[in-house]
Amino acid sequence: MGNNITRTIIGLAALITLLVFLPYIFSRYYIDLSIVFFVNLILAVSFRLITTTGDFSLAHVPLMGMGAYTGALMTKNLGLPFLITLPLAGLVATMVGLVMLYPLIRMKEFAFFIGSYAIGEALRLSWIRLSIFGGHRGISNIASPTISIPGLFTADFSEVLPYYFLTLVVTVVCLLCMYLLDRSRITEIFKAIHDEPELAKSVGVNITGYRVLAFEVGTFFAGIAGVLSAHHMGHIDPHQFELTTGLYLLIWIVVGGYATFLGPIIGVTFFAIFGEWMRVFGAWMPLVYGCILITALLFLPDGLESLPKRLSFLLKKTGAGAKS
């Protein structure tokens, strides 16, 4: 156990060191990609949190959009500072998610999946209809965040390099919070609801309450991801949060695996690296993504996170066969 913890600490320290020096090695293009990568990490890991109870939600991306719109409006119309808009936008997304859950919580499995798409799409279409959200054009000229403590300092994140480090810090904090939750007793209850709902109910577990909790916590972090994305892009519109984006999120999760905390991180990292190479396929990229998904479902149903165990099993089987 001690050796595992030591290796984990060393690995994390090496990774953080790499991420700190990365923007000084690569061009601005790759720094921008890294910021998108950080946002996608928060989005994917928060989505996986919801799946621990057995619920797969296509409303996750629209709720991310709710956080993005809230952060943009608070910045442009109210002039609120970033450190206030960031958590508030997450809370607004959470409250909207709670309203959406009222009809959804009565559904399970496939019905929940389809119902979440319908309600998420209704939310997205409301941004087109309501003028405060800018209609089809969305909201432009979203100011870069600044962090100011009167009498001490003012940090401006209008340049890509400072914003990279801001996004990195927020991502690390969000992932750490979700990791601690994943290691807690609460997530064990989430998994029990997924694996043995009747048994969990028989021992007094409030299944509805814990499903709501998982959904709301995941939605909060999705809202945070939306704020980071809005400030990075400087523009948001309803088309950024369409079904296609939600399907890509599902592919990241399924290919990476969602049984453990590490799975979605592996999935997002895989597509962040190979996604750039796949750009040569142009309009055929969705087909390539589909082929990767089918291959993963056929040969790695538990995702890329299960690859080391699977290879170890095959090597042992081959070794045993050779000895016999």
Task: Show where each model-derived region lies.
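Membrane-interfacial amphipathic/re-entrant helices at transmembrane-helix boundaries
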Residues: 1-41, 81-85, 322-324
